[in-house]
């Protein structure tokens, strides 16, 4: 088999580099593309989200003085899973490539770094090599360098056939170079750029269809560190940064399905600055102006397939200011006024589609600490800032599908005091007045259809304390009255069909004490795992698919 003439312009490989790389290729089973091997530089694949450049540099320090470590990321700062390590002095790249390096329990994929000249960027004729190694996985990576040259990672092939390497160009208009070619199951992946003309820069994000759980790392350049958590099958996750120009800092996290995203700017004439971002499928977009007769001006933009939206302002006469916004499919929306005789004024509205709930941790660097939980299938979410004149700082916003929500009083030992609102589908709404003998006045409203809600305590070993809530379909919900030994008395409303009740006490080792009531029929209680792996991850895929299939059947039957 013949190789390209090494003297050919724009496809030069030095004889020495060619000899070394051919030897490495013979041992590893690589088919090398034409190009120039970058001296003292190693391609590193298999980098997961937990690895940072400092750790990788330390790992490779055994081979020589590390000059630079570059992890390739997309526009949002999320690692693409590979990068390059360059050394100050001459190193034996062939020896490094042939070594076995495991990092965080994961084997790294190593190879020589190959620079492809610009004039040959459209077509690369590989140098064939006949080998018969055990079939390794295939991978191909490209790194766009500022000098307009392209680095090509050699492609692994299990058979002695000629492979053609297609170079993918990075996006020229991106503030950071992005490598495409990542295939996400079922749906296409789209990255949306930040909006340079917006007062608030938003990077949207991830469409992770049907399958696995992926945790997203905190964003080191963000003034608010976010550790996100849960990606619920079929839909997407995206985290929004806090808004520095807003008098109330809010960091929210959302999970969006299938459709497009548009961020809306804050409204400067509003005493409470709100920037909401929503997902707009199929239907038309309508933005509703602020209400001039309201003491608090709110302008929101939402995506509502088929249904209408109304946002309600805060109530100035209430000692605890709460503004909630919800999206109501199929059914009519009614907002109930605050109760003037109640020391705590609450107006709630609700929206009920069909899916799951997810909670995000509080943000320690925020002037207003917020523990929020959101679940957004086909519909929308909006979070409102805390209100400084309230004795209890509250940011609420929930979207609870066909299932139920129950709110618990503030937790005295918790660094974050939370008063939450409620979700009422199909059935009638009843608001219960505050209880004068309670040190914390709560007006609650409940609607209890056919399914369950449960809240989980914070995790004491987590740097971010999280009180999460999850939704358990098929069975019934019931709320029980306050616990007499609790310093905060709460009386709730009830719907007690069919099944048994069990109340679980607060967890004494938890930084946030929670007394919850649950009804668990047939199914077991599970705390959500941290980063499931192996067989456990495969089981989660299977369970997610079964639940999704069940929901589809229920919708079809309805």
UniProtKB/Swiss-Prot annotation:
The lineage of its organism: Eukaryota, Metazoa, Chordata, Craniata, Vertebrata. Testis specific. It holds the Pfam family RRM_1. InterPro entries: DAZ_dom, DAZ_RRM_vert, Nucleotide-bd_a/b_plait_sf, RBD_domain_sf, RRM_dom. Forms a heterodimer with BOLL and DAZL. Interacts with PUM2, DAZAP1, DAZAP2, DZIP1 and DZIP3. This is Deleted in azoospermia protein 2. Keywords: Cytoplasm, Developmental protein, Differentiation, Nucleus, Repeat, RNA-binding, Spermatogenesis. GO terms for cellular component: cytoplasm; nucleus; protein-containing complex. Residues 11-27 have a biased composition (Low complexity). Residues 1-10 have a biased composition (Polar residues). Gene3D superfamilies: 3.30.70.330. Residues 40-115 form the RRM domain. One of its GO terms (molecular function) is translation activator activity. Residues 1-27 are annotated as: Disordered. The gene is DAZ2. SUPFAM superfamilies: RNA-binding domain, RBD. It comes from Homo sapiens (Human). RNA-binding protein that plays an essential role in spermatogenesis. May act by binding to the 3'-UTR of mRNAs and regulating their translation.
